[in-house]
Every structure is written in C-alpha cells, then in structure tokens.
C-alpha cells in the first residue's frame, strides 16, 4: 500500500483547532470538588444474652435457677456461710441470696465505683475479705485488689497489668493469680501463675513454661494448685505444687488429656471432686459463649495421678466465658453454682 504525506498547511490548521478546543473546554470546567468521604461500614451487632444463675445439686443431679436477667452476669462464688453468691455484672459486684424464693433482686456490694470489676473474684475462706480483679481509669488494664467484705478499704495488691486473681489458699495467706508478660525480643506475650501474700509483700512466680497458663485454684489441703494450660498443644488441666513447679516446670503434672478443651478446674471443699469447664475440640480460647459446652467432674487426684482419669459429664449447656471462671462450690460440697446463657436478638452498636 502506498502512503502519502499531509501538507504543512493542513497540519498547522489541525493543531490550531485542537488548541482552541482545549482552551474552550478548560474554560467550561468548574473548580474540582473534594472527594466525598467514605462511609464507615456499619459495626456488627453486639451479642446479647440472658443469664440464668443456676445451682447444680450432686445428690440428685437437679438444676435450679435462682436468678435470671436479660444481661450478662458472671462467675458466681458461694459465700463461706452458704447464704449467698457473689457475682459480677456491668463492672459491679453483687450478692444474690441462695435460699430465697427465686429471682431475688441482686444487692450491690459498695466497692469503689471508679473500678470496673471483671469475672475473677472470691471471698476469703473466713468470709472477711473479697479478692477481685478490676481495671481503673489510671491502669487501663486488670489489676488484683483486696477489700473488706462490705466493699470498704479497697487497696491494690498487684499493680502490674494485666493480672487476674483466681483463688485463695485455704489458710487465707496467699492469693493465686495470673499475669501476662509482655512480648519482648521475639518472645510472644505469655500468662504465668503467681502468688502474693494476702497481708502484702512481693509476688512470687510459680511456673515458667512458655505455654499459656490460666485459672489457678488451690486444693483444699493447700498442697497443689490446679490450673489449665495449652502447654501440651491443647487445653488441659494441670497441677503444680503450691510453692512452685521447680526448674523447667519439672514438677508440673498433666491431669486431663482427652478430646476436650478443659478450663478452670475447681476442687471441692471436701477434696472429693475436681470440677472443670470443657469446650469442644479445637475451641482456641475461653472468650466465647458456645452451645455444647460441658461441665465435667472427676475424682480429686491423690498424690499419684490415675491415668486415664474417670471423668463424668454433669451437664451440657450454652456457656463458656463467665460460666464458672472461679471456684463456685458450696461449703458442704453438695452443690455448685454456674451461669447458663441464652442468646437474645442482637442489638445494633451505638
């Protein structure tokens, strides 16, 4: 195909027309509008639950609900005199009568209102004091506190955050708690078990395994601390001597090792039973409330562990976080308290 060249006059004329058209277009364009702000995606609706504070009776395997509310109540403790439960809701601590007609109004414990309590709390063995975990505007993280039984004389026992109380020694001399070491030098954050004298003093670290350890609770004879850990690759119940696991945690002993994820072991006051919360295999944390959660029980281990332990299922329910985080046995070891949850229609976040 033969090509021809355009004349110089035609080219100049075409360039001029394009230039004039560009100027006219520019004159007709107004100022640039700022981009519209991107709308925030709507927040997910917040879960809501009905709480049923329940009592399980070992004698006949009956379950009685003593209080129900369409809000979250957590972690009931039985008072040493057997008359009431301590439970938390909305950052406050409450007493609920055990022997009332049912659904008696909770009575608030008058603790410093600037503190926001969580679900780790318990009365002392003599009933004169309450240990609890709470955050303050200054701390912005959970610390361990001690107060008189009526809520007065509040003072911080463990300033480091986050730290969570879990159990009294049976003689009332020590508080067992967990503290999260911050991540450092490539080592991830990690929870370990500590104790501190109830009269005040220096905390003592009781284990050193890099696993996540939680929920320490004393045996009634004061010789052992039972807790849950993922150090075996799944969540199981373990125990260590009350004065520590020794170098390399050489004295730590694994108590459970089946297909369930076990949390928050609680020895009965008569030393006959060990109660704990169990999630289905693969549930990574205790932070959720889930269907199919179980409360299981086994005979209290002796000096030597029986393998495998004889574990029985007491109840299967909708529960988890808040159901039984701290010891909730009755003083006579015949009953224990726990919280059953029922999902409610979700409310949109404000």
Positions of the model-derived regions?
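Bacterial N-terminal signal peptides
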Residues: 13-23
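Bacterial N-terminal signal peptides that target proteins for export
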Residues: 2-15
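Sequence signature of WD/YWTD-type beta-propeller architectures
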Residues: 27-350
């Amino acid at each position: 195909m033969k090509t021809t060249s355009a004349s110089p006059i035609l080219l100049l004329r075409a360039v001029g027309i394009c230039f004039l058209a560009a100027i006219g277009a520019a004159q007709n364009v107004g100022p640039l509008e700022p981009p519209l702000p991107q709308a925030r995606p709507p927040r997910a609706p917040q879960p809501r639950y009905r709480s049923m504070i329940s009592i399980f009776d070992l004698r006949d395997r009956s379950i009685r609900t003593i209080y129900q509310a369409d809000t979250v109540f957590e972690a009931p403790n039985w008072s040493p005199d057997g008359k009431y439960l301590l439970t938390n809701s909305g950052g406050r601590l409450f007493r609920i009568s055990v022997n009332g007609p049912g659904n008696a109004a909770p009575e608030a414990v008058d603790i410093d209102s600037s503190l926001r309590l969580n679900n780790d709390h318990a009365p002392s063995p003599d009933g004169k004091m309450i240990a609890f975990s709470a955050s303050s505007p200054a701390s912005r993280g959970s610390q361990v506190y001690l107060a008189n039984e009526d809520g007065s004389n509040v003072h911080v026992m463990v300033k480091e955050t986050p730290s969570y109380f879990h159990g009294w020694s049976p003689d009332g001399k020590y508080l067992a708690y967990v503290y999260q070491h911050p991540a450092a030098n490539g080592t991830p954050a990690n929870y370990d078990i500590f104790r501190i004298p109830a009269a005040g003093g220096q905390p003592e670290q009781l284990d050193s395994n890099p696993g996540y350890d939680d929920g320490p609770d004393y045996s009634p004879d004061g010789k052992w601390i039972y807790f849950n850990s993922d150090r075996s690759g799944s969540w199981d119940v373990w125990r260590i001597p009350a004065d520590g696991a020794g170098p390399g945690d050489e004295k730590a002993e694994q108590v459970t090792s089946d297909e369930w994820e076990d949390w928050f072991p609680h020895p009965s006051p008569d030393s006959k039973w060990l109660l704990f919360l169990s999630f289905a295999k693969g549930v990574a944390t205790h932070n959720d409330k889930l269907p199919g959660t179980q409360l299981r029980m086994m005979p209290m281990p002796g000096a030597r562990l029986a393998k495998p332990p004889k574990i029985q299922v007491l109840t299967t329910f909708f529960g988890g976080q808040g159901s039984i985080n701290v010891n909730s046995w009755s003083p006579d070891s015949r009953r224990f308290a726990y919280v059953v949850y029922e999902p409610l229609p979700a409310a949109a976040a404000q």
